[in-house]
């Protein structure tokens, strides 16, 4: 058993799933020009479970450690269980992260959830079909969606949060836009705070082509 420090070092020195995307996987990437770090996650699904996961990392050692820890945490999980995961579980698996390394867990969470959203957009939405025991809640991160989620849970039904990303204008205040990266993160935090799975489905390209620039 590794102690907290050695857990981080072990993932850096022997990363699980590095440069090993599963066949027929969907991808989710996070990072880019702002910090120079980039993490891409590849997921494959079988019988409602994550049966394959790998990643690539460009940047600091913490990014490799978070990608590796993500592989261990998510592989074999049911889709809804994976959609409950985030930076908190990653930081715990690595024994905590310093302020300088915490951004790596943020990028790993974002890459994971973009890949999960790509699974749904690619045709796996049937796994979230509404039933008497499950209700999809459109989450914006605001008060109304939070109350709706609580009411559904109070009825005894399983609430699953979904945020549709239709438009993102970097020239506007992201905190005031329902589709901005900040709003998506806020919606995910809300869902996870209520112990709900959360999915973000990125429909910006088809929305732009079909609605904004038809």
Which role fits each region the language model picked out?
Residues 1-136, 150, 154, 161:
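Domain-level signature for proteins that mediate thiol-based redox and metal-cofactor handling
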């Amino acid at each position: 058993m590794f102690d907290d420090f050695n857990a981080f070092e072990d993932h850096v020195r022997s990363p699980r799933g590095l440069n090993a995307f599963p066949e027929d996987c969907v991808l989710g990437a996070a990072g880019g020009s702002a910090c120079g770090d980039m993490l891409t996650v590849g997921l494959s699904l079988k019988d409602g479970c994550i049966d394959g996961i790998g990643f690539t990392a460009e940047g600091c050692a913490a990014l490799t450690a978070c990608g590796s820890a993500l592989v261990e945490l998510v592989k074999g999980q049911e889709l809804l269980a994976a959609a409950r995961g985030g930076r908190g579980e990653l930081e715990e698996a690595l024994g905590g992260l310093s302020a300088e390394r915490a951004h790596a867990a943020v990028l790993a969470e974002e890459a994971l959830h973009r890949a999960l959203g790509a699974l749904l957009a690619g045709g796996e939405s049937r796994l979230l079909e509404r039933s008497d025991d499950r209700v999809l809640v459109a989450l914006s991160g605001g008060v109304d969606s939070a109350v709706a989620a609580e009411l559904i849970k109070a009825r005894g039904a399983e609430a699953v949060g979904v945020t549709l990303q239709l438009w993102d204008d970097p020239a506007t205040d992201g905190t005031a836009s329902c589709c901005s990266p900040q709003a998506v993160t806020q919606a995910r935090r809300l869902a996870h705070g209520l112990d709900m799975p959360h999915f973000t489905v990125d429909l910006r390209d088809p929305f732009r082509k079909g609605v904004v620039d038809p």
